[in-house]
Amino acid sequence: MTSTRGEAAGIPSVSLNDGHSIPVLGLGVGELSESEAERSVAAALEAGYRLIDTAAVYGNEAAVGRAVNASGIPREEIYVTTKLAVADQGFGTSQDAARASLERLGLDYVDLYLIHWPAGDHGKYIDSWGGLMKAKQDGVARSIGVCNFNAEHLSNIIDLSFFTPAINQIELHPLLNQAELREVNAGYGIVTEAYGPLGVGRLLDHAAVTGVAQAHDKTPAQVLLRWSIQLGNVVIARSANPDRITSNLEVFDFELTDDEMATLNGLDEGTRFRPDPETYTGP
């Protein structure tokens, strides 16, 4: 399925298992204040982004919605993602939370609604998945998926619901390339979406990354984004800097060689910079 989203900036889209599609590169607004988020989303949409990723726990859904609604871009051309907080997990509460997110965003629907964390000790992510299925059925969300789910979490919800997430958004960068989980996702027909693609900035001065960047006359950030896109991921890059937001788009005019991909793949050491989904329980 093709999409006009992102075409102005040359951002391709990938098809999801439910017939919808999503741009392969988007802006994330985690840890940004409301004012920062509103400015960043406005700058991103002006630059050509069409995928915006927020969450209830970020506290900036209203700001994202203001920027989206003020952009003058037709709603159907913008792909908006938000996420269910751990505190709102449950069959009924997840549906209420989805509608509350819509109200804060000032939108009639979201393109993608995700369970933010499995929070396994709470025992509610399976019930929450049922709630998301109902939210999709009711038109609150066009696609539904998960974040930070491992293979066991995925099999639990799929085996019990007979409904497969469209996306699994996970921390993913060369120090944590998630090869096994990407393979699991692909086996289910789930698109892998990468967050933290720059390794919270720790990879920007890594010799392997800077070497590849110099070879292509690109920035380290552009190389890291390109690496993840070439793996077949959708990538969410967070920034509050308009220049970096624009620069991050300049990843579709070059390709990494097989050797360069292998070099970056070889950096994997299982290093996480974000919480471990096996143990994290909130918020």
From Swiss-Prot:
Question: Do the record's keywords include Cell division?
Answer: no
- InterPro entries tied to this protein: AKR (IPR020471), Aldo/ket_reductase_CS (IPR018170), NADP_OxRdtase_dom (IPR023210), NADP_OxRdtase_dom_sf (IPR036812)
Q: Which UniProt keywords apply?
A: NADP, Oxidoreductase
Highest taxon above the source species:
Bacteria
Q: Which PROSITE patterns match?
A: ALDOKETO_REDUCTASE_1, ALDOKETO_REDUCTASE_2, ALDOKETO_REDUCTASE_3
- The disulfide bonds in this chain are none
What EC number(s) are associated with this protein in UniProt?
1.1.1.-
* Active site as annotated: 58
Q: Which Gene3D superfamilies match?
A: NADP-dependent oxidoreductase domain
* GO MF term set: aldo-keto reductase (NADPH) activity
Q: Which residues bind NADPH?
A: 196, 198, 200, 236, 238-240, 244, 247-248, 274
Asked whether the UniProt record includes Nucleus among its keywords, one would answer no
The family note in this entry says: Belongs to the aldo/keto reductase family.
Q: What is this protein called?
A: Aldo-keto reductase Mjls_1918
Biological source species: Mycobacterium sp. (strain JLS)
